[in-house]
Amino acid sequence: MNIYTFDFDEIESQEDFYRDFSQTFGLAKDKVRDLDSLWDVLMNDVLPLPLEIEFVHLGEKTRRRFGALILLFDEAEEELEGHLRFNVRH
């Protein structure tokens, strides 16, 4: 299982995350532009599953700012039943 790490010391906004996510997985720039399109990418066999995604350097303030993104990945992990692992580390 490949691990993909997103460092929130370098990601300041959701738009930054969408850009980094798209670059990491070789997606077109406009493929991931909001939470709905990110969900579609996760659910529609676009990514090389199985995989693990981890968010690092997420302090409390940053967790609150990116709460919707974290919840989306938590739900995706449940939906994909073992094909996606998601972790958050400080």
Swiss-Prot record:
InterPro entries: Barstar (IPR000468), Barstar-like_sf (IPR035905)
Superkingdom of origin: Bacteria
Record-linked Pfam families: Barstar (PF01337)
CDD domains reported for this sequence: Barstar
Recorded family membership: Belongs to the barstar family.
Protein name as annotated: Uncharacterized protein YhcO
